[in-house]
Amino acid sequence: MELETHLSKYFTLAFTHKSMSLEMREKLAINSSATLKEFLQTIKNHCPNIKECMVLSTCNRFEIYASLRHGAHANEQKSALLKILAQNKKMSVSDLEKCVLMNTDESAVHHVFSVCSSLDSLVVGETQITGQMKNAYKFAFEEKFCSKDLTRLLHFAFKCAAKVRNLTGISKQGVSISSVAVKEALNIFEKERIKDKKALVIGLGEMAQLVIKHLLNKQFEALILGRNAAKFEDFIKELEEPKKVSFQNIENLNAYINEYELLFCATSSPHFIVQNSMLKETIFRRFWFDLAVPRNIEKPVLDNIFLYSVDDLEPMVKENVGNRQESRTKAYEIVGLATMEFYQWIQSLEVEPLIKDLRELARISAQKELQKALKKRYVPKEYESNIEKILHNAFNTFLHHPTIALKKNAQKEESDVLVGAIKNLFNLDKSNANHAQNLNLYKCEYYEE
């Protein structure tokens, strides 16, 4: 009988701003729950060797995190997933192959921890990615595409990200895509000598809200075009100067699109919100920032409109992160240590229940024999308590060395064979299954002392 490893085989596929153009990232982007669920279901239906799966889709990356079944080959899963992506997104496998980064086992864990800690972001240290990963995990968990393996990985990643933020201060230096866009807008405002510090913001999602807050900090006024007036009312309660922000339904876009010199657009729409058919000639130059993926603004045909995409802002981001190198080095040390601790913890997960089961088996056996002796009056009833203590001390002493040896060997690759052999010898497979059933999958079992 083959013993299945208790260590999960983690696997990641990543398409990021480092390896893939904005045009290609747009094709991969998933912006609706229905589309995401359909995509994950396709993976589940066509990739039987993938146990658990989740997808992270943001403006700068499209990533698949998975755990593989025992004996599955990572390259085979990669090929299968690229075929699914190619068919689903109407792209070629060869184009995807050129841009994809695959990681397995420890390198996959290190990658997930780095992404969650914002070390792989366009803007190093931005905290938005952690929230995006939490949402991606929560969706996959609630839709039953991920379970124990990814729960453990992601919760440990969230702990790692918190440690990176707390110990390095990498998130306190105030650089984000939204802040860089507003900073560039301020530079334009000063160079162009624009009279009114006003901006048009299309959208009311997380990115758009960050833009609005940065604009207000720079003493701008903002008109927001959106679909949800109630959401706007809730949002302005967070603002120190709510009177500087007003709201109109996005259906009125045509009435405002040619009135503002500064425009920021960040919605989850898969189509162009701002189209050339809406544009009119103006005597002033216009500066537009499209912070969405897929892009929300069609490439303008008018010469006096200057459009900045997410990728256009990358050089400006790099100018702002030079002083983060020391924090980044420290952060990678934390991620490396967390990766090692994660695997040590995972390796111990099978040993701890086994030790508990062995002790419980010894206790039950001793109690059973004691009750027999009492029933046959081999020992007086009044000695029962003292005999229980003697038996308890006896099996604790007997199991002391095996317990130490099991914990020590948990760190070795051959621990799977040892654990499996002990389970078979003592018929403990069934009892260990109960531990899995009682596991709270929505809460990681790992707690730091």
Curated annotation (Swiss-Prot):
Gene: hemA
Misc note: During catalysis, the active site Cys acts as a nucleophile attacking the alpha-carbonyl group of tRNA-bound glutamate with the formation of a thioester intermediate between enzyme and glutamate, and the concomitant release of tRNA(Glu). The thioester intermediate is finally reduced by direct hydride transfer from NADPH, to form the product GSA.
Protein name as catalogued: Glutamyl-tRNA reductase
NCBIfam families in the record: hemA
Similarity remark: Belongs to the glutamyl-tRNA reductase family.
Tagged with keyword Oxidoreductase: yes
Transmembrane regions listed in the UniProt entry: none
Keyword terms: NADP, Oxidoreductase, Porphyrin biosynthesis
Active-site residues, record numbering mapped to chain: 59 (nucleophile)
Organism: Helicobacter pylori (strain HPAG1)
Chain residues that bind substrate: 58-61, 121, 126-128, 132
